[in-house]
UniProtKB/Swiss-Prot annotation:
It comes from Yersinia pestis. This is S-adenosylmethionine synthase. Binds 2 divalent ions per subunit. Binds 1 potassium ion per subunit. The keyword ATP-binding applies. It is an enzyme of class 2 (transferase).
Length: 384
């Protein structure tokens, strides 16, 4: 492969779409805490002064949608009308119904192993050995930049920062290996009382330099810090936000394919979410086992049917064993039926709010990031 550039972006927890994702997942967590078998599809819309929470929920649990919404917004940091959005005064509207019985009859079964997929669809999982967390470097460092922005905002190091921010990192590759960082973009909302010179200096010293590895920075690395020159109006006052609009940010930053389904607000019976997590788990274990340097998994389902309609393994020529053997190992060691993958990854717990900002993958404490099958795969493949 010749020299090339690759770019990924991320957004902070205060970005309007991420506010919506976090509210949807906070509602999901609150329901799962009381009723692990609940069916939840929660969608959120945010705009200046208002939040609309809707969707389909079938559960015996009762949760306070308004309180969950306000608490989530408060934790993100929108606590004053000067920011254009205030957790304490915004209107919160709820429009939640029940899951269609037509869908429900195809999902719930007497034998849990026969639990059908909650919808048709295709999902992808990916892993690469170019970082220690087996994720692509561009999305990994894009996430870390906006995560650092939130950290120095919340700990008071840069008190003039506001919750909305975006990052973008362009990496240089030569023959598939990282050789440097070509460009960094960091746009952050700020208060009126900070001048651009001080902002640029503080962002460089407190956010960018502590995050990006020095060995990848060169004299030619370009920096674009608040390139419009001003970012006071942000959050839901600047743009409306919707659940599920940041699916590339949520996954691999464009370096792997995407089946199109969003994650946030969906309980694990929705394979859009749970099977994408399982596909990441499979791909990561294959790479961790040393069976490939890069691996992409595709899995697909039919609504109401337990067995996947297809499983595909792509290693981009980096596989250490024949490709068809990789597929056989996946089928042998991973149960990708809806009930099987929920059990395999222990997904019926309130763990989802935390996934809704800074990426669903590459964060080691999530169960789909375990590499507990790597040794088994390596032994079965006959590698020393």
């Amino acid at each position: 492969m010749a020299k090339h550039l690759f770019t990924s972006e991320s957004v902070s927890e205060g970005h309007p779409d991420k506010i919506a994702d976090q509210i949807s997942d906070a509602v999901l967590d609150a329901i799962l805490e009381q009723d692990p078998k609940a069916r939840v599809a929660c969608e959120t819309y945010v705009k200046t002064g208002m939040v609309l929470v809707g969707g389909e929920v079938t559960t015996n649990a009762w949760v306070d949608i308004e309180e969950i919404t306000r608490r989530t917004i408060r934790e993100i940091g929108y606590v004053h009308s000067d920011m254009g959005f205030d957790a304490n005064s915004c209107a919160v509207l709820s429009a939640i119904g029940k899951q269609s019985p037509d869908i429900n009859q195809g999902v719930d079964r007497e034998n849990p192993l026969e639990q059908g997929a909650g919808d048709q669809g295709l999902m992808f999982g990916y892993a690469t050995n170019e970082t220690s967390v087996l994720m692509p470097a561009p999305i990994t460092y894009a996430h870390r930049l906006v995560e650092r922005q939130a950290e120095v905002r919340k700990n008071g190091a840069l008190p003039w920062l506001r919750p909305d921010a975006k990052s973008q990192v362009t990496f240089q590759y030569d023959d598939g290996k990282i050789v440097g960082i070509d460009a960094v973009v960091l746009s952050t909302q700020h208060s009126e009382d900070i001048n651009q010179k001080d902002l640029h200096e503080a962002v460089m010293e407190e956010i960018i330099k502590p995050v990006l590895p020095a060995e990848w920075i060169t004299a030619h690395t370009k920096y674009f810090i608040n390139p419009t020159g001003r970012f006071v109006i942000g959050g839901p006052m600047g743009d409306c936000g919707l659940t599920g609009r940041k699916i590339i940010v949520d996954t691999y930053g464009g370096m792997a394919r995407h089946g199109g389904g969003a994650f946030s607000g969906k309980d694990p019976s929705k394979v859009d979410r749970s099977a994408a997590y399982a596909a990441r788990y499979v791909a990561k274990n294959i790479v961790a086992a040393g069976l490939a340097d890069r691996c992409e998994i595709q899995v697909s389902y039919a609504i109401g049917v337990a067995e996947p309609t297809s499983i595909m393994v792509e290693a981009f020529g980096t596989e250490k064993i024949p490709a068809d053997q990789l597929t056989l190992l996946v089928r042998e060691f991973f149960d990708l039926r809806p009930y099987g993958l929920i059990k395999m990854l222990d997904l019926l717990h309130p763990i989802y709010r935390e996934t809704a900002a800074y990426g669903h993958f590459g964060r080691e404490h999530f169960p789909w990031e375990k590499t507990d099958k790597a040794a088994l795969l390596r032994d079965a493949a006959g590698l020393k």
